[in-house]
A protein has these predicted regions:
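Active-site neighborhood of divalent metal-dependent phosphoester bond hydrolases
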Residues: 45-131
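A short, hydrophobic C-terminal helix/tail in secreted or cell-surface proteins
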Residues: 132-136
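N-terminal active-site segment of His-dependent metallophosphoesterases
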Residues: 1-54, 67
Length: 136
């Protein structure tokens, strides 16, 4: 089993697919994704659908773009002029995808490593880090 860690996919399905092919990604491998799965690239919908299907292999933490998407879906934010979320927001399964995405963590710990999107807030204690990471 191999573990691959990537960050900031940002809706770039074609590039993610090509990279996984180049890595010869297998069913027994793990894909660690350090947030920002959506927005900026053209295929946020494909990225989320594929990663949801890979739920047993993918270890995901949320990034600011993912949180922005969730805030749009569940209220509180509007899509901005630079957002590339129109296809995703108009998808018939957008709510299912959003509910799946919001179950992902802000940090993940495994194999002796801790993964976050952009560091750890100073107000979090080590106990909280450990507690949240163990919340698998």
């Amino acid at each position: 089993m191999a573990v691959y860690a990537l960050g900031d996919i940002q809706g770039c399905w074609r590039e993610l697919k090509a990279l996984m092919k180049k890595l010869n990604f297998k069913d027994s491998d793990e894909l660690w994704l350090a947030g920002d799965l959506v927005n900026r690239g053209p295929d946020s919908l494909k990225v989320l659908r594929k990663l949801r299907d890979m739920d047993q292999q993918a270890r995901i933490v949320l990034g600011n773009h993912d949180l922005h998407f969730l805030a749009i879906v569940f209220g509180g934010h509007s899509a901005g002029a630079k957002d590339t979320l129109a296809e995703l927001l108009g998808a018939c399964d957008v709510e299912d995808l959003a509910h799946w995405l919001r179950r992902q963590k802000l940090l993940y710990r495994g194999h002796g490593y801790l993964m976050t999107h952009a560091g750890l807030p100073g107000c979090w204690s080590c106990l909280l880090y450990t507690s949240d990471a163990a919340d698998e």
